[in-house]
Amino acid sequence: MNRLTLALDVMGGDFGPRITIPALSLALEKNPMLSFVLFGDQSQCSPLLNSLPVTQQQRITFVHTSRIIEADIPFTQALRQSKGSSMRLALEAVARGEAQGCVSGGNTGALVGLAKLLIKPLPNIERPALTTLIPSMNGKSSVMLDLGANVEADSQLLCQFAEMGNIFAEVMLDLVHPRLALLNIGTEENKGNQIIRDTHQLLKQRYDLNYIGFIESDKLMNHFADVIICDGFSGNIALKALEGAAKNILSLLKKPTPDSHLCQTAKRYLLRAIFYRYYRKLQQINPDRHNGATLLGLSSVVVKSHGGAGVNAYFYAIDHAIGQIRSGIPDKISQGLNRLHQNL
């Protein structure tokens, strides 16, 4: 296995280095050929880095910057203030070839904008799309894109998302002819706005893609499709609704309620039985395990973590980035698009 270097925006996210540094420690422990280039404030990071094992510290290069991009500022303001920030420096390291990929939990709009500005897009890609794997109740996963990089998308752009999602599913899920579906408010031919209906007609004509039609949001976790295509506005809402529902289910089972002693005892035994029997299934829908959306369509791997991610969730975002780099996702997307367009 070859050595791999990731650039990490240590300051990105709601909790900064208190989360990112313990998470990268887990990644270093799991991957002996992994190293990091970190970008962040030395005064905040040094105590946490010094607590890591010496063998891990030897695989970390630290670059100090006190500048960060705030999570709540508009996109244009974020770009103007980005020079010298931890996010921009991490992306510039990837652009220079000093790292094979970047992970950040910072401002989504700024990350998407800077990544498109600094990292070369793949040929024939109009716009990259935020892409992730969502869990299904049968233990398998589905690819979903776009999740917020493009709030608006016309039919041509949605078809391009379908092409990229198709290749991503082939590589990451080891599928042949993945089933593609278009997110809509119904499955009937006349449902949806004009863009959705036009996209539906275009995809029906693509015999190189296994397009199966519309899918509704209540079926997203039923594995009716391997790839779910949507604009960034709809995708972001749908994904957060899924994650919120999953978190509420998990917390509901753990949360104590003011019942009588007898009810509490009965409930405790019941919940214990449920957890023993369904623990693995519950973990399959744990949003932490699926944290990290890839900005698909760039020549390097860029992964966006949830800003509010905890240590385990951030570790999974790093782990997903590593897996995509090892799988050569950017090259596979480029080769796959060339193959698809040659067959048109």
From Swiss-Prot:
It catalyses: a fatty acyl-[ACP] + phosphate = an acyl phosphate + holo-[ACP]. GO terms for molecular function: phosphate:acyl-[acyl carrier protein] acyltransferase activity. It is found in: Cytoplasm. GO terms for biological process: fatty acid biosynthetic process; phospholipid biosynthetic process. Signal peptide: none annotated. Keywords: Cytoplasm, Lipid biosynthesis, Lipid metabolism, Phospholipid biosynthesis, Phospholipid metabolism, Transferase. Belongs to the PlsX family. This is Phosphate acyltransferase.
